[in-house]
Amino acid sequence: MRKQIGRLAVIALLVSACGSGSATATTPAGTVPGTVGGTVAGSTAPTTGLGSVGLFASALVEFNSCDAFLGHVKAEALERVGPYGLHGAGYAGPDVWDDVVLEVAVAEMAESAADAPTSVTAAPSPEPEAGVDYSTTNVQEIGVDEPDIVKTDGNRILVLSQGILYYVDVSSGLPDLLGWLDLWSWESQIVKDEDFWRYEMFLGSDSALLIAGGNGAVGDLTQVVQVDLSDPENLAATATLTVEGRYVSARLVGERASLVLVSRPHERIPFVYPASRSAEPRAEMANRVTIQETTLEDWAPSYVREDAGGASRGLFLDCASAYAPKEFSGFDFLSVLSLDMAGGIDIEAVSTVMSGGDTIYASSTNLYVATERWVDWFALDEEEAISEAETIRTYIHQFDIAGPDGVEYLASGSVDGYLLNQFAMSEHDGHLRVASTNDPSWGWWLRDGPSVSRVDVLAREGRDLRIVGSVGGLGEGEQIFAVRFIGEVGYVVTFRQTDPLYTIDLSDPENPRVVGELKIL
């Protein structure tokens, strides 16, 4: 396939160096709900005096029907499509000559579905012996479990290694391997013909929830497997759920798991590609026609659910729980899926925002997903690209994970700079504390400039996460290397040549202040 390589090469370097967040979408099993109309949620008024909350954070478009959602996506695509598709959003399609346009069929998700083993009635798991101590996964918040490859409740140890789940009984004080389940074996066919390389799990009272992330024939895939633990010598998968999308992470509160996925189904749209500059107008026209003819299935990720009763498939998107920023933020779909481990793998609740998703943090009631601001680098010249990259912002989406609906989108906000990891976020008394670093020299092509870090305190007002307090000027010329929040105190470590430790009093959310500083040479 011949490809034109021109000025896009420089922009491609910008994209690969800066990177942009991925995103995901979701829909519950069965039919997709829909009523006509779309509404604007939240206000657009920025917070004054404490830095901008960002237009992205306010005025999210809420869709009440699939027609409204599809119309929004197609309108955004028609505004941005060119002879090379959606600015290199993935598959480029076939060459287009001056007198012909080649058509390519859209790749579909593999439809093979092997019968899952019959479910076994689960027996209650043994309670750990009083006074017996055992280690658990290192978690950020008490009561909020995080996925791991080893889990224990004091009586049993589950180990997930290279696609095999091992059940070890330790109730007698000595380890006894009772059984295992091979996810890759031809007999089980739990993981089929895909390249899954990331495995994690949660341990519930009667079952284990295995989560696999990897690549399939149509891009990123996430597979969730529920394993019945009632008969350790005959472990059996009772249900599996395979979804188009990249697995970001998950959290477990009680028996309810919240999974975060980012999907890019738009990459499979069969845009054509010009074989010469004179063919560009024809290619752009063909790509516009392609967008106009797309359906919801072309833009939304799909899922396949399998259990002893057979397989079902559908779109992983609930249009009634889908949102898009008023400021366009890409065609990725950020999805939060709620699963009840006690009730099996049923797509009970899913909420979607058209945005990226990179870092997650959860309290016992709320889940936050952070991603760096999306920029259409291909639409910018060199000076515009430098200006955008010098003003790094991180956007944060808040979801309720404690309500009766399983998961519900609440609000969005933004802070200057980028986050180190999940520990850069912490919720306390209804406020979200966020530590970030703003580095104008981030990237080899940018101008020199001092980096500086800060801690912002955000509170929800309607659909907005607004900054109500800030403390800045932390470690000028340095970046954050470690963060911890403990109650009303925050600890931030920055580093370049020295290793400063800042102690921050957060007892007054509207007036955070540095109360201690230690520099280690």
Model features per residue range: what roles?
Residues 18-521:
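Beta-sheet-rich non-transmembrane sensory/scaffold domains
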Residues 1-8:
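Bacterial N-terminal signal peptides that target proteins for export
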